[in-house]
Amino acid sequence: MSFHKEDGVNSLCQKALHIVTELCFAGQVEWEKCSGIFPRDRGSQGGSSTDISVSLLAVVVSFCGLALLVVSLFVFWKLCWPCWKSKPVTSNITTLPQSISSAPTEVFETEEKKEIKENEKPAVKAIEPAIKISHTSPDIPAEVQTALKEHLIKHARVQRQITEPTSSTRHSSFRRHLPRQMQVSSVDFSMGTEPVLQRGETTTSIGRIKPELYKQKSVDSEGNQNEDVKICGKLNFTLQYDYENELLVVKIIKALDLPAKDFTGTSDPYVKMYLLPDRKKKFQTRVHRKTLNPLFDETFQFPVAYDQLSNRKLHFSVYDFDRFSRHDMIGEVILDNLFEVSDLSREATVWKDIHCATTESIDLGEIMFSLCYLPTAGRMTLTVIKCRNLKAMDITGSSDPYVKVSLMCEGRRLKKRKTTTKKNTLNPVYNEAIIFDIPPENVDQVSLSIAVMDYDRVGHNEVIGVCRTGLDAEGLGRDHWNEMLAYHRKPITHWHPLLELPGRATSFDSQGSCPSPKPPSTP
């Protein structure tokens, strides 16, 4: 009986517990009343809330870490990206000398310590890394890289110094600053010397200045003439410019050691002075009787603007006065550069040698013309291009120039042609061609006489100056003719100085025997 009673009580207890559980979890009874009945469920409920808070904390920490990582990446990109971005740009812009020299510098700095410890090792190992690094530069041509590598390997031992072995590679790296156009194989990399071009100079010397190409014949000829000119005394004068009144003040002080022109062994000297190219304004000193060392002490003034002084020349002519005949010229002094001594702001004293001369050398101007000869047609063309700085022949300070060309043979004038007249100018431009028929067999027998004339409506036309060209001419006239014969069918152009007419009979109107040129054979 007792056994059945216990079973009934247990079943009732289980049913009661089941009912209480349903009521507590259904929410119909306050949880505080049920907490004493279900202690384990309370602990599990607290554990579940703890698990939820831990998971939330883990989520927050993960989010903060991710945000910190993003910020770190952003800062790293801002700091390092400009450097990486600039590397390809600078490598493309850098020229060949920079691309070659930048790589070996780092390599040689690391190799210095090795060379101090191991002096017996060849320098080729230190050079090869530099060459390999330079291969990465896109600006270096493959041919230059190959030539540079071969030459550096060949001259590796030469680059060492006995006293300072560590500096040899460093200096050799600087010597590789070569232009792109220069041939590397033609440069000497030896220490202590500058690169010297050898056989490759002819193909790589583009852009180099060769002074011998700029030598002018006129300068050389003037130097030779100055060596042959005889000195006949010295002239002392002073120069100063008056800025307020725009005047060039010239004071002729004295002359020394003049030659004797009279039979008594003395002279009666005086000085005439021009400021070229203007000959209208002329000054003359007093005549000093019977002396070879006259003391003039006279001052003259030329009205001229300061900015025009660079284009002016001061011309002194020393004469011997003769009462009964023509005055004899002793010599002359020409000061080409007025700023030779100073800027003329203060009085400058000048001593010049007097060059002996029998006639006064006058700057008559220059003429430019071209010569062209066609041997097959037997035709010579002289093109008068222009003149410059002609002598003023009219009282107005200008001229009416034209050019007359005469075909001469042994002093006889065969034909003559002339250009049009240009009015009131000292720098006429013509561009007119004059043609003469000259067979090839007669070219060596003829010459051309060119005279610049001043047209005068009332009186006779005056000769300003003349020049000649031909095999029998002198200086530039002969050279111009020979150059024309050497280069057929090609116009040869030169400037020619105009000279004074030595005599009408010898230049234009003299008669002589000369075979007339045969007409060119017609095919």
From Swiss-Prot:
<dbReference type="GO" id="GO:0098978">
    <property type="term" value="C:glutamatergic synapse"/>
</dbReference>
<dbReference type="GO" id="GO:0016192">
    <property type="term" value="P:vesicle-mediated transport"/>
</dbReference>
<feature type="binding site">
    <location>
        <position position="400"/>
    </location>
    <ligand>
        <name>Ca(2+) 4</name>
    </ligand>
</feature>
<feature type="binding site">
    <location>
        <position position="322"/>
    </location>
    <ligand>
        <name>Ca(2+) 2</name>
    </ligand>
</feature>
<feature type="binding site">
    <location>
        <position position="394"/>
    </location>
    <ligand>
        <name>Ca(2+) 4</name>
    </ligand>
</feature>
<feature type="binding site">
    <location>
        <position position="320"/>
    </location>
    <ligand>
        <name>Ca(2+) 1</name>
    </ligand>
</feature>
<comment type="function">
    <text>Ca(2+) sensor specifically required for the Ca(2+)-dependent exocytosis of secretory vesicles containing IGF1 in neurons of the olfactory bulb. Exocytosis of IGF1 is required for sensory perception of smell. Not involved in Ca(2+)-dependent synaptic vesicle exocytosis. Acts through Ca(2+) and phospholipid binding to the C2 domain: Ca(2+) induces binding of the C2-domains to phospholipid membranes and to assembled SNARE-complexes; both actions contribute to triggering exocytosis.</text>
</comment>
<feature type="domain" description="C2 1">
    <location>
        <begin position="231"/>
        <end position="352"/>
    </location>
</feature>
<keyword id="KW-0597">Phosphoprotein</keyword>
<feature type="binding site">
    <location>
        <position position="325"/>
    </location>
    <ligand>
        <name>Ca(2+) 3</name>
    </ligand>
</feature>
<dbReference type="GO" id="GO:0070382">
    <property type="term" value="C:exocytic vesicle"/>
</dbReference>
<comment type="similarity">
    <text>Belongs to the synaptotagmin family.</text>
</comment>
<keyword id="KW-0472">Membrane</keyword>
<feature type="binding site">
    <location>
        <position position="328"/>
    </location>
    <ligand>
        <name>Ca(2+) 2</name>
    </ligand>
</feature>
<keyword id="KW-0106">Calcium</keyword>
<feature type="region of interest" description="Cysteine motif">
    <location>
        <begin position="13"/>
        <end position="35"/>
    </location>
</feature>
<feature type="binding site">
    <location>
        <position position="268"/>
    </location>
    <ligand>
        <name>Ca(2+) 1</name>
    </ligand>
</feature>
<feature type="binding site">
    <location>
        <position position="322"/>
    </location>
    <ligand>
        <name>Ca(2+) 1</name>
    </ligand>
</feature>
<dbReference type="GO" id="GO:0042803">
    <property type="term" value="F:protein homodimerization activity"/>
</dbReference>
<keyword id="KW-0677">Repeat</keyword>
<feature type="topological domain" description="Vesicular">
    <location>
        <begin position="1"/>
        <end position="55"/>
    </location>
</feature>
<dbReference type="InterPro" id="IPR001565">
    <property type="entry name" value="Synaptotagmin"/>
</dbReference>
<feature type="binding site">
    <location>
        <position position="328"/>
    </location>
    <ligand>
        <name>Ca(2+) 3</name>
    </ligand>
</feature>
<dbReference type="GO" id="GO:0005544">
    <property type="term" value="F:calcium-dependent phospholipid binding"/>
</dbReference>
<feature type="domain" description="C2 2">
    <location>
        <begin position="363"/>
        <end position="496"/>
    </location>
</feature>
<feature type="modified residue" description="Phosphothreonine">
    <location>
        <position position="136"/>
    </location>
</feature>
<dbReference type="GO" id="GO:0001786">
    <property type="term" value="F:phosphatidylserine binding"/>
</dbReference>
<dbReference type="GO" id="GO:0000149">
    <property type="term" value="F:SNARE binding"/>
</dbReference>
<dbReference type="GO" id="GO:0007608">
    <property type="term" value="P:sensory perception of smell"/>
</dbReference>
<feature type="binding site">
    <location>
        <position position="321"/>
    </location>
    <ligand>
        <name>Ca(2+) 1</name>
    </ligand>
</feature>
<dbReference type="GO" id="GO:0030658">
    <property type="term" value="C:transport vesicle membrane"/>
</dbReference>
<dbReference type="GO" id="GO:0005546">
    <property type="term" value="F:phosphatidylinositol-4,5-bisphosphate binding"/>
</dbReference>
<keyword id="KW-0812">Transmembrane</keyword>
<keyword id="KW-0968">Cytoplasmic vesicle</keyword>
<dbReference type="InterPro" id="IPR000008">
    <property type="entry name" value="C2_dom"/>
</dbReference>
<keyword id="KW-1015">Disulfide bond</keyword>
<keyword id="KW-1133">Transmembrane helix</keyword>
<feature type="transmembrane region" description="Helical">
    <location>
        <begin position="56"/>
        <end position="76"/>
    </location>
</feature>
<dbReference type="GO" id="GO:0006887">
    <property type="term" value="P:exocytosis"/>
</dbReference>
<protein>
    <recommendedName>
        <fullName>Synaptotagmin-10</fullName>
    </recommendedName>
</protein>
<dbReference type="GO" id="GO:0045956">
    <property type="term" value="P:positive regulation of calcium ion-dependent exocytosis"/>
</dbReference>
<feature type="topological domain" description="Cytoplasmic">
    <location>
        <begin position="77"/>
        <end position="523"/>
    </location>
</feature>
